[in-house]
């Protein structure tokens, strides 16, 4: 049966359409049933009126439960008050499947329960919106590179070497030989760039990090371009252009989804401004509060954040008490109960987030004030830095000891590596890591020894410096961290359909 898509309803205003989908939510009043339908392309309210449908079809509409599947026909009416901006006034309805006891109800559910039912949680309005935004980012990423002459290539997932050390590798057996799941396709990307000029890979990456932070997954998707005849500055220019382009695509195509997840768009719109670029040494001074940014000290900003969080905790606790008292009142209508339950759930989630911030902020303040130059940034250090800027921050020229063996050393001052990390604002931290690649064969060999990596496993990589070596650069972007920032999500687990992370491999 050919039907229309909810996402196309704007084309059908004033006309009759046929739709198929599922009941996301329902409510009823005297002789009226309001069904929020989803079909994957969008959401809309369908109105079943007894006087129009007749008793038999009206009773069928009234019997529909959450996640039941149904077919309907009706007239499209523009209504900006409704979800998606349209309403369908039904002239026909037919049940396709009657769902019973759908486990994810409007009441509050804990994170573990929702993750155990991830296969069903994906149907929720919020998760639908996040996945739609993820899709836009993926398509925009491919479009950006394809439009600029890059060739999409594929790096192997099984490898016999470690790109950035062995401590976080998943080991496996490859026909009797030890092998690892890839941490990065970058080394292979360099080889492909020497053949094609400009390439990018887009594939799964695996890190065996026993970390349960809001930023870590064990399986995630990486975008890794590599460019021949490209230095650090050109690489940084491309990164800035790239992030501006893909975020702008979401702002253009996903306004409804951003509204559904209540993501303020003003911070995202600031990607049109030039990104902040600061060397590592200056970033350290900012983190320690020794250098002001627009008259502000990082430590003072964190102290203000802590005071604001504590006020928010008190206000949210008061709201929770008031909501609980209202729910305890007799005689509430079903719609009122649902509204208060939804608001109570949202308030408790805000409280959990605020209480976590209250625990973290004093530690971040102590860590920032005592940060030692020469160390890599931790997640809290990145958060501190991003609190002072409204655009992404590009930190470049890092101590070579904290960067990967393949990062190019500065010929004029070998203490520094020509690397760059891009930190997303609003406390999200690193989303891009990249830099210029080492072309000095002797320095590269020394680095492989220094990192205690098996030289024989990298002979093929060293061949890239023996035959036609040229300046080249690249970067890696973790898709899920990008999605988390764009959607302003508190945890990276919501950025991928079925997250794999420490302690969870199902469903």
Give residue ranges: language-model regions.
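Class II aminoacyl-tRNA synthetase catalytic cores and aaRS-like
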Residues: 1-507
């Amino acid at each position: 049966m050919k039907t229309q898509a909810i996402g196309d309803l704007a084309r059908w205003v004033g006309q009759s359409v046929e739709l198929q989908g599922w009941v996301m939510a329902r409510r009823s009043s005297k002789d009226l049933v309001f069904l929020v339908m989803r079909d994957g392309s969008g959401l809309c309210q369908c109105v079943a009126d007894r006087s129009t449908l007749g008793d038999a079809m009206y009773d069928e509409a009234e019997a529909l439960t959450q996640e039941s599947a149904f077919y309907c026909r009706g007239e499209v009416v523009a209504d900006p008050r409704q979800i998606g901006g349209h309403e369908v006034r039904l002239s026909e309805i037919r049940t396709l499947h009657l769902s019973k006891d759908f486990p994810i109800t409007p009441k509050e559910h804990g994170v573990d329960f929702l993750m155990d039912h991830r296969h069903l949680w994906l149907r929720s309005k919020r998760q639908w919106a996040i996945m739609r935004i993820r899709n836009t980012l993926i398509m925009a990423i491919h479009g950006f590179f394809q439009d600029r002459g890059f060739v999409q290539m594929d790096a192997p997932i099984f490898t016999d070497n470690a790109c950035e050390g062995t401590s976080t590798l998943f080991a496996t057996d490859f026909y009797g030989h030890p092998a690892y799941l890839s941490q990065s396709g970058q080394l292979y990307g360099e080889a492909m760039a020497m053949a094609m000029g400009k390439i990018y890979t887009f594939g799964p990456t695996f890190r065996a990090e026993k970390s349960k932070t809001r930023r870590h997954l064990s399986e995630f998707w990486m975008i890794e371009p590599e460019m021949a005849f490209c230095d650090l500055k050109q690489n940084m220019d491309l990164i800035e252009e790239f992030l501006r382009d893909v975020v702008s695509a979401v702002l253009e195509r996903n306004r409804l989804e951003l509204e559904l997840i209540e993501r303020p768009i003003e911070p995202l719109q600031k990607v049109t401004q030039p990104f902040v670029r600061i060397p590592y040494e200056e970033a350290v001074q900012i983190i320690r509060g020794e250098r002001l940014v627009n008259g502000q000290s990082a430590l003072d900003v964190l102290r203000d954040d802590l005071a604001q969080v504590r006020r928010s905790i008190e206000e949210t606790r008061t709201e929770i008490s008031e909501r609980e008292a209202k729910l305890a009142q007799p005689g509430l209508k079903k719609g009122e109960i649902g509204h208060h339950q939804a608001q109570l759930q949202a308030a408790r989630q805000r409280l959990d987030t605020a209480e976590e911030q209250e625990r973290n902020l004093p530690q971040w303040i102590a860590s920032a004030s005592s940060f030692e130059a020469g160390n890599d940034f931790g997640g809290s250090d990145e958060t501190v830095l991003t609190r002072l800027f409204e655009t992404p921050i590009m930190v470049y020229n890092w101590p070579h000891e904290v960067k990967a063996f393949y990062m190019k050393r500065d010929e004029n001052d070998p203490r520094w590596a020509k690397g760059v990390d891009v930190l997303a604002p609003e406390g999200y931290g690193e989303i891009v890591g990249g830099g210029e690649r080492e072309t000095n064969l002797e320095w590269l060999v020394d680095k492989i020894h220094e990192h205690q990596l098996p030289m024989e496993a990298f002979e093929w990589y060293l061949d890239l410096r023996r035959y036609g070596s040229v300046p080249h650069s690249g970067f890696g972007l973790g898709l899920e961290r990008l999605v988390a920032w764009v959607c302003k999500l508190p945890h990276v687990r919501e950025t991928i359909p079925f997250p794999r992370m420490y302690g969870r491999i199902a469903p």
